[in-house]
Structures are given as structure tokens and as C-alpha cells.
Regions:
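Hydrophobic h-region of N-terminal signal peptides that target proteins for export
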Residues: 12-20
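Low-complexity, acidic/polar, glycine-enriched regions of mature
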Residues: 20-184
Length: 184
């Protein structure tokens, strides 16, 4: 049987489309990313005001999912204008040199009904580490809602240098908490 080039191309494109998850459009108004940490042993939750997420997800084929997130490091809002400027400086995020923190998934696996196990690379301040975390996914108002929390050690990413390496003031443990709403 002879297959012409355009027929072969159409067949290959059809296979490629079947083998990927659907790209979703994130809803920034209904999405949040925040850093949760302790300062002088007092819990603080500080939102990042600017971030973007790209999610390819099909509930019927979760293992084909992909996700990436970029966070504007200078957009962390710790609740006080002077402190917001401080965390953008060199000792903390060094936002002038490293304006973005990012996460790119390498594998997303089903972990039961409404649960996913995510593995990927987290990059903050030019330092990258492999990370894994669970997340939940549910349908809400015709959209998918992805929620999770990723615990990290801030010093592994050089966030808090100089006098700020002292973890008695700001704990080394930080949880990146997120809720991303996305739909077609």
C-alpha cells in the first residue's frame, strides 16, 4: 500500500495530537502562589503577586501532563513595602540578577483519584534541584484546580545570604504553596 506524503504527515500529526495532554489557560484572578515560613518563630504567608503557569493536562491521561511555572521574585509581598524591597536585594532573591524562579515538570503520575505525584526541576537564584511533591486536582466551575505545597530549604538556593544565613531569625524551611485554576 502506498501512502502519499500529505497522508503520512496527517497520520503523524494525528498520533502526535493523541499523545499529548490538552493545554489549559490559567486564570490569574483565581490562582495563587505563596511562600510560607517562620520569622522569629512566627508563621508568615507571603504571596507572589506576579507569576505564570503553563499546564497541559487531560484527566483521562494524567501521565501525559506537563507543567511549568515562572515566578517574578521581586513580586513577593511580605506585607510591608520596605521589607518587600529587602527581599528583592542580593542577600535574598537578588531579583536584579535572577528575576525569575521556575519549576518545570519532568514527570506527572496519577496517585489515585484526584491526586497526582509531580517531579521536576526547581530553579531559584540560579540554583536548580530536583523536587517531588503531591498535588490534588479537582474540577470546579468547569475548570481544573491544582493545589499543592512544596517544602524546600531556602539556603539550598542561597536565599538568605550574609547575616540572613542565620536560621534563628528566618527559618530555613519554606513551603511554596499554590492553587492554580485553569481551563480550556
Amino acid at each position: 500500500m502506498k501512502l502519499n506524503r500529505s497522508g503520512l504527515l496527517a497520520a503523524l500529526l494525528g498520533v502526535a495530537l493523541v499523545a499529548t495532554a490538552a493545554p489549559l489557560k490559567t486564570d490569574p484572578a483565581k490562582s495563587t502562589v505563596s511562600a510560607v515560613f517562620k520569622q522569629m518563630n512566627v508563621p508568615v504567608e507571603a504571596p507572589f503577586k506576579k507569576f505564570s503557569a503553563q499546564i497541559d493536562y487531560d484527566a483521562a491521561k494524567p501521565d501525559l501532563a506537563k507543567a511549568s511555572v515562572e515566578i517574578d521574585t521581586a513580586s513577593l509581598d511580605v506585607g510591608e513595602a520596605e521589607m518587600n524591597k529587602e527581599v528583592a536585594k542580593k542577600d535574598w532573591f537578588n531579583s536584579a540578577q535572577f528575576p525569575k524562579a521556575s519549576f518545570v515538570s519532568s514527570a506527572i503520575k496519577s496517585a489515585g483519584a484526584g491526586k497526582l505525584s509531580v517531579t521536576g526541576k526547581l530553579t531559584i537564584k540560579g540554583k536548580s534541584n530536583d523536587v517531588s511533591f503531591p498535588l490534588t486536582v479537582k474540577s470546579e466551575g468547569g475548570k481544573q484546580v491544582f493545589e499543592g505545597a512544596l517544602p524546600i530549604k531556602r539556603l539550598a538556593y542561597s536565599v538568605g545570604e550574609g547575616e540572613w544565613k542565620d536560621t534563628s531569625m528566618v527559618a530555613d524551611e519554606v513551603t511554596i504553596k499554590f492553587r492554580v485554576t485553569a481551563g480550556q
